[in-house]
């Protein structure tokens, strides 16, 4: 018997943002899958996110984690990811520079910056703190007070840390992870951790708010913010909250479908700009950049 199930396009916020920045870069990275220039800021961000996730889950379980242990996790994760990038691209001349720092020097610099960001995050967590939301239980056992913890049809309540989602928007499946959903003044707020510059855009947060509503059948969080881990010497703190109420399901769906239509039509026109092209990780394969 033939399986006639239709596979839906699978998208993410990062895919949409990449296409919007430059359709040609999207094609090179996502379709042609060309080699991507490595940058030390990528492992720095990944390692910090891992520390924040592990730290918050420890607190949710009633366990304390020392600064020393948190920084040890950062060291391990950073070394692992840097090692993987070095295996693929051992010549540091091919790595991204960061200001005056070449690839090799930037690896060392961001190692220390990441340790500092971990320290600032934990200091902020202990001083200001954040209240992590607990998701509602889902599934057929929800009326049984979660007696069957092995039920594969159900999802137990859990702290909203590194929260996965997979939602359908009228024929397009959108998936991703939410760093944290917090409770501020009794209301939900989606939060994303950033180790670099502030995005200055709330679309990502709007998608996260919609994902929370669709996944857990709750009212969509009205606000969202970015926790800025802080560059060297700069205090770590969340941004001012973004008002997400304009990011309705209809508006978000329309945006994904607009991009999807252009992808399916093969519209991959390059949008070159000096600053943008200089930091594009597939620029070495781009005929326009060359």
From Swiss-Prot:
Name of the protein this chain belongs to: Gene 69 protein
SUPFAM superfamilies xrefs: Restriction endonuclease-like (SSF52980)
Name one matching Pfam family. PDDEXK_1
Q: Which InterPro entries does the entry mention?
A: PDDEXK-like_dom_sf (IPR011604), PDDEXK_AddAB-type (IPR038726), Restrct_endonuc-II-like (IPR011335)
